[in-house]
From Swiss-Prot:
Gene3D superfamilies: 6.20.20.10, DnaJ domain (1.10.287.110), Urease metallochaperone UreE, N-terminal domain (2.60.260.20). InterPro entries: DnaJ (IPR012724), DnaJ_C (IPR002939), DnaJ_domain (IPR001623), DnaJ_domain_CS (IPR018253), HSP40/DnaJ_pept-bd (IPR008971), HSP_DnaJ_Cys-rich_dom (IPR001305), HSP_DnaJ_Cys-rich_dom_sf (IPR036410), J_dom_sf (IPR036869). HAMAP family: DnaJ (MF_01152). Zn(2+) 2 binds at residues 164, 167, 190, 193. Homodimer. This is Chaperone protein DnaJ 1. Keywords: Chaperone, Cytoplasm, DNA replication, Metal-binding, Repeat, Stress response, Zinc, Zinc-finger. It comes from Cutibacterium acnes (strain DSM 16379 / KPA171202) (Propionibacterium acnes). PANTHER family: CHAPERONE PROTEIN DNAJ, DNAJ HOMOLOG 1, MITOCHONDRIAL-RELATED. Its cofactor is Zn(2+). A zinc finger (CR-type) spans 134-216. One of its GO terms (biological process) is protein refolding.
């Protein structure tokens, strides 16, 4: 290294005091003998000397004029390098995030035995009618609850947690080692109290000192009308009780809706398929049918059926909409619709009399085999046309 203190620290001659300090930190951390090895001691001394001169305005002015700033102040001599008015502990603080092992330092302190519990997730199976119209159901939930014997304290009746003799309540043990830099202090959680700062000499036999036990409890859950498969209900503070009888987490109940034999759900609409005979489709008819309300014994009888008017000439795939007989809109007013798709059933077995009647009908309508017409695809595939015919 040269004797130019600015060059030693790697700063310009007009560097500010803050720039000089930062440069010294970088150099000192890189060249300190405990980091770079004993061979760097001489270079480290020069860095210390450069910082001592340049951080002092009077010494820096003497050096800038070409004088010897150590002529009156004295140099390092044989006593090793000085601190130059800068605590090396601060350098280590920068590396250890403010938890320096040098000097006294502040520890983490004991951790609390009482902590918030985890959230819990359970699943509830519903029928389609329960999901659509809402229901109140009981549900068994397996979670941790506050120990009924010690009420969360973790200690037997008449016993209390006492200060840990090993760490004196600090929750950590500190070891001190002598080094070239001075005392190096390191801390770790106390092995006796596991960082709590207290020990339970007579733990509760019911919970083994945990302050909580697992149990299966039954809760009543009100399911709002209109929930869908996968929806969740959030219940505050009904989840797992925390260690030490701490506050309970939240409980989430996820809905699983079973399929229905007749109805399917599409958003807020219900869909069903009804088969009618060929004659009814041709002549028109009125079809009474059960609605989803029929699955609920607690509903009025007049809500359980609806009559749908089928117009004459109805074709297979015709869909008729019954307004406001679908799913109640969740957290909104109104209901979706009920869509009824009709399938026209063609008879497969006819006696001779029935065949004669159909022949007479065909003759009256002048229908023959040549009356069949080919539907134009319009660029659509066969499956697309079939799907459209059934309201897809």
């Amino acid at each position: 290294m040269s004797n130019d203190y600015y060059e030693i620290l790697g700063v310009s001659h007009d560097a500010s005091a803050d720039e000089i300090k930062k440069a010294y930190r970088r150099k000192a951390m890189k060249l300190h003998p405990d980091v770079a090895g004993p061979g760097s001691e001489e270079e480290f001394k020069k860095v210390q000397e450069a910082y001592e001169i340049l951080q002092d305005p009077q010494k820096r002015a003497v050096f800038d004029r070409g004088g010897d700033p150590n002529a009156r102040m004295g140099g390092f001599g044989e006593g090793g390098f000085s601190s130059a008015g800068f605590d090396f502990t601060n350098l280590v603080d920068a590396m250890f995030g403010g938890s320096s092992p040098f000097g006294s330092g502040g520890g983490r302190g004991p951790r609390s035995r009482t902590r918030r519990g985890q959230d819990a997730l359970v699943r509830m199976r519903l029928s389609l009618a329960e999901a659509v119209f809402g229901v109140t159901k009981s549900l068994e939930v397996d979670t941790a609850v506050v120990c009924p014997k010690c009420q969360g304290k973790g200690a037997q009746s008449g016993s209390e947690p006492v200060t840990c003799d090993t760490c004196q309540g600090r929750g950590e043990v500190i070891t001190v080692q002598r080094s070239f830099l001075g005392d190096i202090r390191t801390s770790q959680p106390c092995p006796t109290c596991h960082g709590y700062g207290t020990v339970i000499p007579d733990p509760c036999q019911e919970c083994s000192g945990e302050g909580r036990v697992r149990t299966t409890r039954t809760i009543n859950v009100k399911i709002p009308a209109g929930v869908a498969d996968g929806n969740r209900i959030h219940l505050d503070s009904r989840g797992e009780v925390g260690p030490g009888g701490g506050p309970a987490g939240d409980l989430y109940i996820e809905m699983t809706v079973s399929p229905h034999d007749v109805f399917t759900r599409h958003g807020d609409d219900l869909e069903m398929v009804v088969t009618i005979p060929m004659t009814a489709a041709a002549l028109g008819t009125k079809v009474p049918m059960h609605t989803l309300e029929a699955d609920r014994e607690d509903f009025a009888e007049d809500t359980k059926t609806v009559t749908v008017e089928v117009p004459a000439g109805t074709q297979s795939g015709t869909r008729i909409v019954v307004s406001e007989r679908g799913v109640p809109r969740l957290r909104r007013n109104g209901r979706g619709d009920l869509g009824v798709t009709f399938i026209v059933q063609t008879p497969t077995k006819l006696d001779s009399h029935q065949k004669d009647l159909l022949r007479q009908l065909a003759e009256a309508r002048e229908e023959t085999n040549a009356s069949a017409s080919v539907e134009k695809s319009g660029g659509r595939g066969m499956f697309s046309r079939i799907k459209e015919a059934f309201g897809g």
